[in-house]
């Protein structure tokens, strides 16, 4: 390998010139480009990598994260991969015709050069692109999310994965499938798309199109729902949302959004308290969430809802940990879809109750802790059911499906954390038969699985550590003794039985299974012992209808 030295000169009879005059041309141009560096640019490092790439005839050139404002005009002609992401580039030079993969994310590009004919992967998310050049037929994957693109060129038949989230697209491209076997997944979330072309139905049923958070007209939604509900439908799965796609980036100060939930005589003190939290992470989005929550069906129609929210906010003000958790949960729920906000409110109430249980609120009330655990178990099963339901739908807003099961079964399954009303149940695709089946499944699994689930539940472990320290310590000792003495042999036996001895991935999976079985055995024994003692004292029952 030839030595690398950014600062060496090329004498008239240098070794490089005797091999190829091309080296001298490249090196001279790169050295000149290096001398034009702006403050903060690492052009010396870039030139070092360029020369190394050329001398070694490498097919990869990585110039990412060097704070470069430009690239030299003459890149090594043999490269198939170019990574210039996370710089300050406003344009790219002519690209080598050999290039197959281009990574130029998180720059300031306003346009792209002509794309090489063999390009397979184009990753230019987080730039300032307003349009794209013609796309080569070889292109397989493309990420153009977080740009300013208003329209797309024709999509190559080979394109499998397209991410175009958060642009200014007003329409989808035409889709022509024919007998093409390619399974596609295209993301057009958070654009300005108001209608869907009929050509979308040309895609195969294994394909997925994501168009959430777009201002789709009610006519477009109804037409698509009618088409995709037909028994003869064989088109793609389409993910949408009832959000109109108009994201309101304006928000009022956190303290103002919070005090609006309180009676006037408390607002001054509340405002003073919450001013201290204005700069906490996700405070702005939490403020926006509170304003959106006030406009939900539950806020308008449910008696005592405002008082419930105010009481919850008081608890948040008293606990930095709970506030941090809640701000994070609410961070993605400020879209204008009302039911998304409602589902987030459900999750926030779950977060509160689980936090309270972990902090000791139910240490002396095992019956209440069991009831809470039972509700969390039921919600977990409903999420599994909703996830399975989503897979059966061709035109689906996942938020509406998840919320539908919680809302419509809130009374029958005694779900205290679930809102009792939702706005868009009609588009959820959840039927009365789905609800009956879900209720029966929850009750069946609860009867057979709840105690095992409860014995592994984190808040229950926190209670045991505080209130049954000796029993907990003994259980931990038994667990580690079993892991030390039996774990290796049990894993080996399992691998041998499946014919996977020596397989590292299988060993990790078998180890996790043995660990879970060990914990299940130890903690179930401890749980049965403690519950038998506590429930016999207060007359509570483990099984609950």
UniProtKB/Swiss-Prot annotation:
GO annotation, cellular component aspect: extracellular region; host cell cytosol; host cell nucleus
- Domain (NEL) spans 253-545
Location of this chain's protein in the cell: Secreted; Host cytoplasm; Host nucleus
Stated regulation of activity:
Exists in an autoinhibited state in the absence of substrate protein, due to interactions of the leucine-rich repeats with NEL domain. Is activated upon binding to a substrate protein.
Q: How is it modified after translation?
A: Ubiquitinated in the presence of host E1 ubiquitin-activating enzyme, E2 ubiquitin-conjugating enzyme and ubiquitin.
Gene Ontology BP annotations: protein K27-linked ubiquitination; protein K48-linked ubiquitination; symbiont-mediated suppression of host innate immune response
Pfam families referenced in this protein's UniProt entry, alphabetically = LRR_TTSS (PF12468), NEL (PF14496)
- Which residues catalyse the reaction? 337 (glycyl thioester intermediate)
This molecule's function is given as: Effector E3 ubiquitin ligase that interferes with host's ubiquitination pathway and modulates the acute inflammatory responses, thus facilitating bacterial colonization within the host cell. Interacts with IKBKG (NEMO) and TNIP1 (ABIN-1), a ubiquitin-binding adapter protein, which results in TNIP1-dependent 'Lys-27'-linked polyubiquitination of IKBKG. Consequently, polyubiquitinated IKBKG undergoes proteasome-dependent degradation, which perturbs NF-kappa-B activation during bacterial infection. Mediates polyubiquitination of host U2AF1, leading to its proteasomal degradation.
Write out the domain note: The LRR (leucine-rich repeat) repeats are involved in substrate recognition with target proteins.
Protein family membership: Belongs to the LRR-containing bacterial E3 ligase family.
This protein is called: E3 ubiquitin-protein ligase ipaH9.8
What species does this protein belong to?
Shigella dysenteriae serotype 1 (strain Sd197)
């Amino acid at each position: 390998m030839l030595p690398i030295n950014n600062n060496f000169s090329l004498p008239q009879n240098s070794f490089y010139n005797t091999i190829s005059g091309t080296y001298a041309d490249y090196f001279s141009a790169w050295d000149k480009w290096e001398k034009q560096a702006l403050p903060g640019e690492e052009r010396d490092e870039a030139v070092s990598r360029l020369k190394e790439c050329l001398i070694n005839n490498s097919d990869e050139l990585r110039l990412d994260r060097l704070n470069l404002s430009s690239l030299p005009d003459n890149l090594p002609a043999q490269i198939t991969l170019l990574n210039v992401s996370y710089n300050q580039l406003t344009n790219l030079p002519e690209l080598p015709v050999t290039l197959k993969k281009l990574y130029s994310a998180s720059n300031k590009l306003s346009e792209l050069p002509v794309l090489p004919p063999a390009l397979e992967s184009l990753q230019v998310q987080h730039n300032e692109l307003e349009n794209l050049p013609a796309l080569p037929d070889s292109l397989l994957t493309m990420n153009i999310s977080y740009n300013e693109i208003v329209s797309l060129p024709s999509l190559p038949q080979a394109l499998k994965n397209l991410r175009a989230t958060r642009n200014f697209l007003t329409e989808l491209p035409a889709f022509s499938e024919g007998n093409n076997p390619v399974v596609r997944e295209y993301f057009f979330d958070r654009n300005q798309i108001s209608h869907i072309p009929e050509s979308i139905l040309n895609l195969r049923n294994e394909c997925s199109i994501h168009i959430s958070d777009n201002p789709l007209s009610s006519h477009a939604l109804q037409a698509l729902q009618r088409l995709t509900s037909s028994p003869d439908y064989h088109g793609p799965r389409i993910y949408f949302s009832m959000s109109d796609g108009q994201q309101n980036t304006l928000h009022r100060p956190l303290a103002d959004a919070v005090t609006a939930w309180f009676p006037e005589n408390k607002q001054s003190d509340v405002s003073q308290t919450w001013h201290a939290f204005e700069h906490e992470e996700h405070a702005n989005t939490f403020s926006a969430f509170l304003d959106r929550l006030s406009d939900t069906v539950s806020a308008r129609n449910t008696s005592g809802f405002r008082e419930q929210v105010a009481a919850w906010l008081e608890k948040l003000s008293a606990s930095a940990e709970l506030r941090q958790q809640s701000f994070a949960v609410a961070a993605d729920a400020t879209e204008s879809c009302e039911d998304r906000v409602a589902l987030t409110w459900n999750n926030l109430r779950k977060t509160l109750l689980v936090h309270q249980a972990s902090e000791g609120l139910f240490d002396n009330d095992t019956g209440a802790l069991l009831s809470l655990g039972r509700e969390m178990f039921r919600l977990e099963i409903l999420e599994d059911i909703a996830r399975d339901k989503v897979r059966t739908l061709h035109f689906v807003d996942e938020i509406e499906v998840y919320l539908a099961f919680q809302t419509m079964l809130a009374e029958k399954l005694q779900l205290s954390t679930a809102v009792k009303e939702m706005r868009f149940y009609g588009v959820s695709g959840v039927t009365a038969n789905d609800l009956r089946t879900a209720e029966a499944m929850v009750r069946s699994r609860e009867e057979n699985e709840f105690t095992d689930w409860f014995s592994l539940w984190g808040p229950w472990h926190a209670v045991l550590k505080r209130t049954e320290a000796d029993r907990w310590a003994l259980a931990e000792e038994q667990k580690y003794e079993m892991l030390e003495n039996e774990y290796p042999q049990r894993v080996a036996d399992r691998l041998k039985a499946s014919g996977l001895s020596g397989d590292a991935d299988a060993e990790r999976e078998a180890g996790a299974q043995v660990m879970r079985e060990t914990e299940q055995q130890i903690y179930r024994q401890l749980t049965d012992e403690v519950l038998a003692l506590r429930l016999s004292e207060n007359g509570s029952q483990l099984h609950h209808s």
